């Protein structure tokens, strides 16, 4: 792709978004997908896979803080964390901020994503790949969760949309495998698209996850890069109390962890589980 052109996202047929390409840093096909990293004056460095924006330097902190701190602080004493996907390293960066976590395993199907993001998105990983608690596994996420002998307290599915390599991370086989290697009282979370435009994804995930977990729901965050409204995150656990912890408990855990965030705070944590009525109605109609 030439510089000083417009890059158009291809996720939706009838509408979408575009970014001015000021400088192409990398554009190649990896073993699994088309990967481009370019610079944009408004959003900094932008990474897209197969024509869909995955992350930008300007607003990635919202996504990664919410995917990480909500489940980890709700759990309260997570020692072992599994990240599925997350090759840009930002999810890992946020998990490493929790000093009580003892092991962090990241399973990424595409070694190319990890390699090129380390080089071209250094602010995302911020050196977290060198954390001694971290182990990288290059494997398919479904295969890993169904074969591993490890167990985890929190599983974060930092998946792409349910197309291409990411499609398998929205299947019953994946959810069943996650339940299999999740410790009692553990929490599973996953990105679940922009529910106003991708409502069927949320409905499908809710239906499938409900076969394996007693408490299934969603929480949300407004992330400008993800076109169409508020990003939805799936939540699943067998500890029904964790989604309804008091603000005092979350506040105490937040301060004990010593976190300083740019988006997440205990009030946001509680508010994130308030869902729009159209999503309640859609889930009730299943």
Curated annotation (Swiss-Prot):
EC number: 2.5.1.16
Cystine pairings recorded for this chain: none
Cellular compartment(s): Cytoplasm
Record domain PABS: where: 5-238
Catalytic EC class: transferase
Signal peptide (from-to): none
Keywords carried by this UniProt record: Cytoplasm, Polyamine biosynthesis, Spermidine biosynthesis, Transferase
Reaction(s) the record says it catalyses: S-adenosyl 3-(methylsulfanyl)propylamine + putrescine = S-methyl-5'-thioadenosine + spermidine + H(+)
Domain of life from the UniProt record: Bacteria
Transferase among keywords: yes
Pathway where this protein functions: Amine and polyamine biosynthesis; spermidine biosynthesis; spermidine from putrescine: step 1/1
GO molecular-function term, one example from the UniProt record: spermidine synthase activity
HAMAP family membership: Spermidine_synth (MF_00198)
Function, as annotated: Catalyzes the irreversible transfer of a propylamine group from the amino donor S-adenosylmethioninamine (decarboxy-AdoMet) to putrescine (1,4-diaminobutane) to yield spermidine.
Name listed for the protein in its UniProt record: Polyamine aminopropyltransferase
Gene transcribed to yield this protein: speE
